[in-house]
């Protein structure tokens, strides 16, 4: 896939007691890349890049706005969880959540104004209506996919909920690194979501033993370019 450069290298060394292989990845942000150079992934539940580039929510960090997860094989699906996406300062906090299928997310309003949260995404459509400070409404996400969340009143508000049946999910650390140990051998799809790039996909083969290293290049984002 053009615009998504990944380097895969299988390392031979491994312990016989190892239950599976490790996938170690690194997200690299490239100032020279732009959204037009990224071909959208052919994926039924894909999330497309955001056209209007709304303002960033504070506090989550550059890589906190990137989600990675692995699909395929025996994912040993994790049960639903309860999570929260606050409405604060006319932003969603956090801006990006990754949750298992069937999870319930609360959307409390912490602002002294009304909000009206909604989504038109195929994976989960909803409209929570108008509600004031101190009130909260919940949404259950029964289907895997990417759900983009907005506010009818404040167009700058934007959030994303990644819903997946995979147990291998992560936000990269502040250096852009992520890893999962003990992945059974087989063929998988590495999924990467970033607001500017949308959803990107790369097929990865996990060997019986050793480690697979993956490097993913995405466009660099900043608060200035987001507006």
Task: Indicate residue ranges for each PLM-predicted region.
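Extracytoplasmic copper-binding redox domains, predominantly the cupredoxin/blue-copper superfamily
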Residues: 17-227
């Amino acid at each position: 896939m053009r615009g998504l450069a990944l380097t895969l290298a299988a390392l031979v060394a491994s312990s016989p007691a190892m239950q599976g292989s490790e996938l170690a990845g690194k997200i690299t942000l490239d100032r020279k890349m732009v959204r037009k150079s990224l071909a959208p992934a052919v994926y039924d539940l894909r999330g497309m890049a955001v056209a209007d580039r709304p303002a960033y929510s504070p506090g989550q960090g550059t890589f906190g706005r990137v989600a990675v997860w692995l699909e395929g094989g025996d994912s040993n699906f994790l049960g639903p969880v309860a999570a929260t996406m606050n409405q604060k300062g006319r932003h969603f906090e956090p801006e990006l959540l990754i949750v298992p299928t069937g999870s319930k997310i609360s959307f409390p309003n912490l602002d002294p104004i009304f909000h009206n949260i909604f989504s038109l995404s195929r994976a989960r459509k909803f409209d929570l209506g108008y509600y004031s400070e101190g009130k909260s409404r919940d949404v259950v996400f029964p289907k895997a996919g990417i759900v983009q969340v907005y506010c009818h009143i404040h167009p700058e508000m934007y959030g994303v909920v990644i819903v997946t049946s995979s147990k291998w999910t992560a936000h990269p650390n502040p250096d852009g690194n992520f890893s999962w140990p003990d992945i059974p051998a087989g063929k998988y799809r590495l999924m990467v979501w970033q607001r500017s790039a949308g959803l990107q996909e790369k097929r990865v083969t996990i060997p019986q033993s050793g480690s697979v290293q993956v490097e993913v290049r995405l466009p660099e984002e900043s608060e200035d370019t987001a507006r």
